[in-house]
Amino acid sequence: MKAVSPVRPQSRKAQVPAVCGELALHCLSEHSLGVARYKMEEEETLCLQYDMNDCYSRLKRLVPTIPPNKKVSKVEILQHVIDYILDLQLALDTHPVLLRQQPPTRTPLTDLNTDPAALVVNKQGDSILCR
């Protein structure tokens, strides 16, 4: 029985054109690029997740109705945040000092649009952004 060498003979290597070597390098680099892209997407996803977790932690610290030593889910944090915002809005709407204040006087927009003399801006609040 004849022993077969696992290494290709030199004559066979000489027959393989140089293009195959370049193609192999190209395929390898394409594969490396694909792996690198995948890793970048994975890292971006992780960064986004860490950012979101950081935001939830910050909300948990800022909203006084969330117990500090109790573990709460993200949904519970959002529910507390919504309730807190609604409470703040209600407090602003019903605050006695704010209710007594007169709204600032300003020229109605209909007068500004119909009267050419009113195009001159007298006050900062009277300016119209789009003309």
From Swiss-Prot:
GO molecular function annotations of the record: bHLH transcription factor binding; protein dimerization activity
Xref: SMART domains: HLH
GO CC entries: cytoplasm; nucleus
Domain annotation bHLH: ranges: 36-88
GO terms (BP aspect): negative regulation of transcription by RNA polymerase II
Taxonomy, superkingdom: Eukaryota
Function: Transcriptional regulator (lacking a basic DNA binding domain) which negatively regulates the basic helix-loop-helix (bHLH) transcription factors by forming heterodimers and inhibiting their DNA binding and transcriptional activity. Inhibits the activity of both neurogenic (neurog1/neurogenin, neurod1/neuroD) and myogenic (myod1/myoD) bHLH factors.
Complexes and interactors: Heterodimer with other HLH proteins.
The name this protein goes by in its record: DNA-binding protein inhibitor ID-4
Protein species of origin: Xenopus tropicalis
Source taxonomy: Eukaryota, Metazoa, Chordata, Craniata, Vertebrata
